[in-house]
Structure formats: structure tokens, C-alpha cells
Design a protein with these regions (language model features):
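Hydrophobic anchor at the beta1->P-loop junction of P-loop NTPases
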Residues: 1
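Non-Sec secretion/translocation targeting segments of pathogen effectors
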Residues: 219-222
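The conserved Walker
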Residues: 5
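Conserved lysine of the Walker
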Residues: 9
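Conserved substrate/cofactor phosphate-moiety recognition/catalytic segment
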Residues: 14-54
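A glycine- and Lys/Arg-enriched "phosphate-lid" helix/loop adjacent to the NTP-binding pocket
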Residues: 89-168, 178-181, 190-192, 207
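Conserved nucleotide-sensing/catalytic segment adjacent to the nucleotide-binding pocket
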Residues: 38-93
Length: 222
């Protein structure tokens, strides 16, 4: 899942998790803010990115190796950590780190990334510590468009831009995912690279379970 604050990512991700009967990976950043009662600092961005990817890797390791189609919903994609790092700290280095981790996961577990990008055309609502305002949300959208995830990497660079209410976004997402399920080769071959809402991870086969717990990682950040 891609999108700035208050763009309906979580509502859509949870709905699609039910629709497709697949796992849902929540946002490490939100857990961090809830536990630490503050926004992360620049030096904590790496740990948040790693914890988000660890959660995805652990969920992938629990799946049936023969599973196909949409297999996991990530709310949000690890790419959003890189977007926020640039937006709030002026740090572009996180893009390379996010790409390396995302492709390592894709290579290890043999799946393709597919992203759903939620527009900012819904009413902005404050929720306490984490949200900064409509202008910040608009900045996030602009940065996602300027720095799309995994650009130019065959099979992993598909992004669907979603506008409208939840029902409309849900309908379009269902249709798009159904189309891809009928034509998985449309995503291209898996990347062979040692260097991963995405909202959706596209499954080919499964490998080993990672060692680190994302909950432990988040606790250590605080």
C-alpha cells in the first residue's frame, strides 16, 4: 500500500484482506508512535524499515509454498519509509536501502510486488500524534509520484492509482488483482538480485523464516 497520512490505506487493506482471505501486515510506524508517543527521529528510520520488512518476511515464511495469486497485504509498503525519510528529513539514501530489502525479499520468497497508491481525495482527519495535516499528505502524494517504487524493475514496478471512496477503490483493486491472478506472467519474471502495499505481494514459492521479530525491533527503537 502506498499513500500519505489519512488516505484510506488501512481501511482498503483490511477490506481486501477479507476479500481475498490473505494475511495483513500492519504499519510498524504506527506501532512505534503508539509505543513511544512521538514521531521517529532520522536515526530511527533504518530500524523502522528493517522491522517492516522483517514482518513481511515472517508472514511469507508461514505461507503454503504452493500458494499463488495475491498472498499478502502490506499496510504500507516498506517504500513509504523511504518516502517519509525524504519528506521529513531530506534523506534520499533510504530509497536504495528500501529497494535492496524489497528485492531481497522478492528473490528469497519468489514473488512480485504490486502497489496500490491511495489518492488524497478523501477528508483529512486528525488522529493524535501521527498525522501532520493535509499539506503534508499532498507532499507525500507528490513524492510517491516522483519516486515510484522499484521503478524500471520488471515484474515489480506496477502501481495502480486509486481515487474515490472506499467502495470504488475496493472494486477497482479487486478487478485488478483478479486480472493479475488470471495472467501472473503479466508481472514478469522474478528478479535475480541479492540486493520488497507494496500493498500486495505476488507469490511464486516460499523459503526460510527470518530470525528477528518486528515487535522486538520496534521495542528496541524506543
Amino acid at each position: 500500500m502506498l499513500g500519505g497520512e489519512c488516505t484510506g490505506k488501512t481501511s482498503l487493506a483490511q477490506a481486501l484482506s477479507v476479500d481475498f482471505k490473505i494475511g495483513y501486515i500492519p504499519e510498524v510506524l504506527r506501532d512505534f508512535v503508539d509505543q513511544c508517543q512521538r514521531s521517529p527521529r532520522v536515526e530511527e528510520q533504518d530500524a523502522i524499515l528493517l522491522a517492516q520488512c522483517d514482518a513481511i518476511g515472517e508472514a511469507l515464511s508461514e505461507l503454503d509454498p504452493g500458494a499463488t495469486g495475491p498472498i499478502l497485504i502490506c499496510d504500507p509498503s516498506p517504500w513509504m519509509t523511504a518516502i517519509y525519510s525524504l519528506q521529513y528529513f531530506g534523506d534520499q539514501a533510504m530509497f536504495a536501502k528500501a529497494q535492496a530489502l524489497m528485492l531481497a525479499l522478492a528473490n528469497a520468497h519468489q514473488f512480485n510486488w504490486f502497489h496500490l497508491h491511495c489518492a488524497d481525495d478523501i477528508v483529512w482527519r486528525a488522529d493524535g500524534l501521527q498525522r501532520d495535516g493535509p499539506s503534508h499528505r499532498a507532499n507525500s502524494l507528490a513524492l510517491i509520484e516522483q519516486y515510484p517504487p522499484l521503478r524500471g524493475i520488471a515484474g515489480h514496478d506496477r502501481v495502480e492509482f486509486l481515487q474515490g471512496g472506499l467502495d470504488e477503490r475496493r472494486r477497482i483493486s479487486q478487478c485488478r488483482l483478479d486480472d493479475l491472478a488470471k495472467c501472473p506472467e503479466c508481472l514478469g519474471a522474478p528478479v535475480i538480485n541479492a540486493e520488497i502495499i507494496a500493498m500486495h505481494s505476488w507469490r511464486r514459492k516460499q523459503t526460510a523464516k527470518p530470525d528477528k521479530s518486528p515487535i522486538d525491533s520496534c521495542t528496541r527503537i524506543c
